[in-house]
Amino acid sequence: MVEISRWALVLLMLFICSATAAEPDEDHHIKLTKEVVASEDIISQLISGEPVRYDNVTISGSLELAELQGSLSQPIKITNSIFLGPVRFAAASFDEPLDLQGCIFRDNVNFFGCRFAGGAGFAGVTFEGQADLRNTDFGGQASFLSAQFSEDASFRNSQFAGDGIFLNSSFARDVDFDFAQFQRLASFADARFVNVSFLETQFGGHTSFLNAKFHGNAAFAATRFAGSVVFREAGFLLGSTFGLSSFGGLADFTNVYFNKTAYFGGGKFTDLAYFVNARFDGDLNMEDSRLYNMRLDNVSLQEDSKINLNNADFTKLEVRWAVIKDRLVYNGAAYLALVKNYKSLEWFDDADDCYYQYRRIGQDQAPWGWGKISDLISWLSCGYGVRVSYTAFWCLFTILFFGVIFWAGKGMNKFEIVGMELPGDHRLRPTARVSFTDALYFSIAMFTTSQAPVNTYPVGFYRHLAMAEGILGWFFLGLFVVVLSGVLIR
């Protein structure tokens, strides 16, 4: 029994040793079997028309097809491989799909002027050098899913007839899509950019920048979005420019973060512009823009952030006045347009507050003259016609003021009559000084009816004050009725 246990222990130790020794041998075997293919061999296959299929190989040398005549009609599939030298396929035409999924390009890549009739697969590709894809024609789907660009890249003036997929792609340096055209879906969701430019780029289908992050300057100048575009959850950490851009469908900027100035000057939104819960740490410039329906519900603005609506034309702008009242750049036309907008939304309190601030700022900026004096009177008396409380205050103040004057100055007497009360009767006799209640009652009567109560009459100079109070009463009561009608009857 002891002998059997001893042999079992020996066999177990031999098994463990063999397994431990086999592990590095296996890794070494994998490294040795990674095939190295010369670029000349691939060029020969391409020229001869042979199908090109490689996986997990290392391609040495420079891969150039500058002298190739005609198009490449064979399928080309090189996946999970490493290109050590530069790759140049300038002006090449690929009739069949090109699949370079998972490859790594150590040097520069040039596909300038290429035509991909069957689509191009660059999913998971890493470009460690510069990537030149200018004037490229993608006839089918162009997939750059999770592609990484370590140096500058350019898709300038490229045509995307199929879907353009840049989902989860990363651009560590500058990239431009200037004058490019996307006829169908364009997806940049979860993409990462430093400096990116979409100058006069045209997006014909649905476009998505969902959760994209722009760490540098993002330029969408004169960009045309024919369909809906989604920037939901995106972050613009430096400047963002959408000047002269046009949005033909829904523009979704929900929960977007703008760290610097967001410039939409001259932009055109023909459908709903949705900025709900957006955050602006800089300014929002909508100068000269055209807005059909813009929603700014629950937006977050810094204390020094400004909103510029100068010369903006908007049909419907949904944002509460309390959110923008201290941040709106003053422009008379913009304020009056906002007043009209609030009235159409039936936000009458917001309309009144907006109009009040418009008049107040205009009054402060106006030079001294009759116009400014009339504005001061309008401000103090009725709050430019939108503050009925101002007029009510002056009514009560006038009554109380004159009541105190009449009482404190002994400016009125109260007469009593023995027997019948007859005007001018010799039996009328003055009593002692009137009480404050009687003086206040007299002031109310003069303010509302301009007629003194029976047996109460001002004396001396106070008769003129009573007449003045009657005139002020007619003025303030008439003003009160007008302002109250304007506030209550919409």
What is each of the regions a protein language model found here?
Residues L336-V339, E469, S485:
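Short, well-ordered alpha-helical packing segments
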Residues A22-D375:
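N-terminal leader/targeting and pre-domain segments
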Residues V388-K410, I471-V482:
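Selective detector of the "anchor" transmembrane alpha-helix that sits immediately C-terminal
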Residues A8-S18:
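Bacterial N-terminal signal peptides
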Residues M1-A8:
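Bacterial N-terminal signal peptides that target proteins for export
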Residues W370-V388, F415-L472, L479:
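Pore-loop/selectivity-filter region of tetrameric P-loop cation channels
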